[in-house]
A protein has these predicted regions:
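Positively charged, polar, low-complexity stretches
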Residues: 1-88
């Protein structure tokens, strides 16, 4: 099982976040770097994702992008019993 800790204070762009997830969780080369593709990949992944300082996403990415990203994480974890999400 892949384990990934995302420190939101260190994420400054959506592209950086998608790249981190793709590289660390081994997404396929054709990963689309968007929220729909993220959901698809996460619902097919066995992983534990921990997000530190989630409030920093809103500061760094903007409120709407941060909310959308976190919603995809929650929805993916709900749909996939092999995906564990920890928000700290």
């Amino acid at each position: 099982m892949a384990k990934l800790t995302i420190n939101a204070a260190e994420i400054h762009t959506a592209e950086q976040l998608h790249r981190l997830l793709s590289e660390e969780l081994g997404f396929p080369r054709y990963y689309g770097m968007n929220l729909d593709a993220l959901y698809d990949c996460l619902t097919d992944s066995e992983a534990e994702i921990t997000v530190l300082h989630p409030e920093k996403f809103a500061e760094n990415l903007g409120e709407q992008k941060a909310e959308s990203f976190l919603r995809v994480l929650y929805d993916s974890a709900e749909a996939n019993p092999l995906l564990t999400l920890n928000i700290e």
